[in-house]
Amino acid sequence: MIEIKPYIEHAVLVGLITPSQPEERTKEYLDELAFLADTHGIVPVKRFTQRLDQPNTATYVGEGKLEEIRQYIIEREESRDEGRELVDVVIFDDELSPRQIRNLEKAINHRDRSGSGAKQPFGSVRVIDRTILILEIFLQRAQTSYAKTQVEMAHLQYMLPRLTRMWSHLDRQRGGGG
């Protein structure tokens, strides 16, 4: 008999060290985030931290740290033959704005395959924040249909502004009429 194992997601965790959140507290928060990920069935494989005065408004982390995260994901993809699993999700410790999620997903899910500097899509690594992770845990554990509906509503209300303009590349496409 063939045994089918459930797919286990692997995650990268990201946190910031700021003047109001010292390194030790960031480490504690990332430990808690790792526990939440594990509770949801996601295996944390790497942690990234960056020291900033405040989060980058466009991408939460700086350009160099974002590139470091992206390169780590690419290296894991390229070393799959060595038994390393792909990174499926990047989890940020703080709440991300809709713009930050879009920018992060765009940056993380593109890479240069030709050597020409042109970036090509290479995967669908999800970007989520602590709140989304907690909502997903609640949804996973909800027992009654009412509870599932309530959690799903909360999740959708949280995600609505994050989905706005997701398909903005279609904005200018209009049907022609004769």
Predicted regions and their residues:
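N-terminal accessory targeting/assembly segments
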Residues: 1-134
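Extended, highly charged alpha-helical segments
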Residues: 120-121, 131-178
